[in-house]
């Protein structure tokens, strides 16, 4: 059985947040809850924990890939400066996490967030994720499963969406 490695991040920014209703990544694809975690390159502790977890999953799951770690394995932290033409990803790494199971969504005091407008792309918080090995349809790598998210503070909404309160505040 494949082994996974769990990580609770430091403060990240959430993007492409679909934590209340699952979305299909591709038309006709499986519905999943998902979020992109934007991690400052200055957050060495979170980056180190993620990289160690990924390396542990690779070592513990060689059998998933036929006994050795394949070259060109997919997964891991991605460089926002290199891959995204978006100021929200500047000086940051990112990783996409998803799950078929609905994640827990809580506030800074660990109270469940029920109001869907309270957790959004652009807010800041922490995430609990699990890294796992996969070998499916010729694609091999280390995936990132979404467990839970915790909102710690507000942030400017990403994607140009504003609330009525923001639009009409005097």
Task: Tell me the role of every PLM-derived stretch.
Residues 108-125, 132-142:
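Exposed beta-sheet edge/beta-hairpin loop segments within beta-rich domains
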Residues 136-156:
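OB-fold/S1-family single-stranded nucleic acid-binding modules
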Residues 1-6, 156-170:
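Acidic, gly/ser/pro-rich intrinsically disordered tails
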Residues 96-114:
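Beta-strand/loop nucleic-acid-binding surfaces
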Residues 99, 131-133, 148-150:
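Short, flexible loop/turn elements at secondary-structure junctions
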Residues 1-94:
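OB-fold ssDNA-binding interfaces and closely related basic DNA-contact patches used
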Residues 33-35, 127, 147:
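Hydrophobic residues positioned within well-ordered beta-strands of beta-sheet architectures
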Residues 39-41, 131-133, 153:
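Beta-strand elements of well-folded, non-transmembrane domains
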